[in-house]
Amino acid sequence: MNISKLPPLSPSVIRRILFYLLMLLFCQQLAMIFWRIGLPDNAPVSSVQITPAQARQQPVTLNDFTLFGVSPEKNKAGALDASQMSNLPPSTLNLSLTGVMAGDDDSRSIAIISKDNEQFSRGVNEEVPGYNAKIVSIRPDRVVLQYQGRYEVLGLYSQEDSGSDGVPGAQVNEQLQQRASTTMSDYVSFSPIMNDNKLQGYRLNPGPKSDSFYRVGLQDNDMAVALNGLDLRDAEQAKKAMERMADVHNFTLTVERDGQRQDIYMEFGGDE
């Protein structure tokens, strides 16, 4: 078996190879020198820390979705406008609204609600008697209730329908008219007077039956400070006064006019 040998390299080829190797080493050293000259001695060396990418979005949970819409708490009852108020359905609860002290500030307004011949005074965000429902707004002639996820309106003497207790509709209407004619709200309207977030009394103005209002000596915008001896400037006493109004047919109002106080006696009821 013949093995061919490579011809020996000539001296000129060897010199050329050595020259290229030396030039390569020289260029490498020269590059390192220029790199060190160009870089400042105190230049901070930046370090890069690679961390796993974090999700930009919050994880989706089942609580983010609602099957039947948003509850009234999230919609805020205070956001109800006049058009929504007029379109609310009447309440189906077995309650009657027998009196209202309503003003611009809902937190100072009081509603008198009757259930099973008992009177209860309630304010905004307070639960009505006998039901897991609360008052979200008090108006001069109605209150707005939040019950089982929806809003309902409880109007003055509007909850007794013709089918209750088996009483014929005509008889119920007659009873309602007689009862409505003896409510204080028909003669006097109350609205809170606030000063520095303190209740000063209630502004009086005539109700639908204004003749009786003026006949007893009351004047527009009189300020009532007491009702039947109960101080209307005290929230608890004011509630008690409102509760008793539905059971009496006469009362004494203490009004403050031009810095002077005077008691005005008023009797209502019957066909007056």
UniProtKB/Swiss-Prot annotation:
Function: Involved in a type II secretion system (T2SS, formerly general secretion pathway, GSP) for the export of proteins. Required for the translocation of the multiple pectic enzymes.
GO biological process, one term: protein processing
Keyword check for Protein transport: yes
Family under the similarity heading: Belongs to the GSP C family.
Cytoplasmic side: 1-16
Pfam families membership: T2SSC
Record key words, sorted: Cell inner membrane, Cell membrane, Membrane, Protein transport, Transmembrane, Transmembrane helix, Transport
Organism superkingdom: Bacteria
Protein name: Type II secretion system protein C
Compartments where found: Cell inner membrane
Periplasmic topological segments: 36-272
Primary localization: membrane
TM stretches of this protein: 17-35
Organism, scientific name: Dickeya dadantii (strain 3937)
GO cellular component labels: plasma membrane; type II protein secretion system complex
